[in-house]
Every structure is written in structure tokens, then in C-alpha cells.
Design a protein with these regions (language model features):
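Charge-dense, helix-prone N-terminal extensions
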Residues: 1-110
Length: 110
């Protein structure tokens, strides 16, 4: 399934002109990287994937609409999936964009 281009545009606008920001198509989505580290990705159906501090994954799953990201039946530490309905407005999407961008920016550049 192709990524949601309208959602990618919203993410792009929210990220603005941050230093080290690049985009890369991967896994059928469009990933936004900061310093070479994935921060957030637009995927199909209006869903997003967000990179967070692995220590924050469980608390975020417990208190937000996020779910653990799974790949090939295995949970990916520090990655969360957020369904379209939870990011339908820019304020909600902006919170997730900031979470992902903040964590990616805290990592050493690649």
C-alpha cells in the first residue's frame, strides 16, 4: 500500500526546515530523517510510524492511541504505530511529529 501523500505533506509542514532533515521512501512509506535517524514515517491509510525513546514506549502505549510496531511478528523497540483517526488534526499530529523529531535529533548523526 502506498503512503498517504496528504499526510506526508502535513508532516513536512510541521517539521519545517529543521537542520539535517531528509526524506526517504522505505517500506512502502515516506520516512522523515533527522541527522540520518528516522523520526517519523507516513504510511498507507493515514497511519504514521513514530520513533520514540524505547523507555517511553510502554507508557505511551498505555496512555495514548499508539500501538507497538511489529515487523515480521516481532515488536520493534522504540517504534509505535498510530492510526489515522488519532492524527486527523494538526495539533495531534504535531505532538507525534515533535516526539519523533526530538528523539531522532537526540541520537548521534549517521
Amino acid at each position: 500500500m502506498a503512503y498517504d501523500e496528504e499526510l506526508a505533506g502535513r508532516i513536512r509542514t510541521l517539521l519545517g526546515d529543521r537542520a539535517g532533515l531528509t526524506e526517504q521512501k522505505m517500506f512502502g512509506g515516506l520516512a522523515f530523517l533527522i541527522g540520518g535517524n528516522m523520526a517519523i514515517a507516513a504510511s498507507g491509510g493515514g497511519r504514521i510510524l513514530v520513533r520514540v525513546d524505547p523507555a517511553e514506549s510502554d507508557p505511551l502505549v498505555a496512555t495514548t492511541p499508539a500501538e507497538p510496531m511489529e515487523m515480521r511478528g516481532r515488536q520493534m523497540a522504540g517504534w509505535l504505530r498510530v492510526e489515522a483517526g488519532a492524527v486527523s488534526d494538526d495539533a495531534a499530529l504535531g505532538e507525534w511529529v515533535e516526539r519523533g523529531a526530538g528523539y531522532a535529533a537526540s541520537l548521534p548523526p549517521k
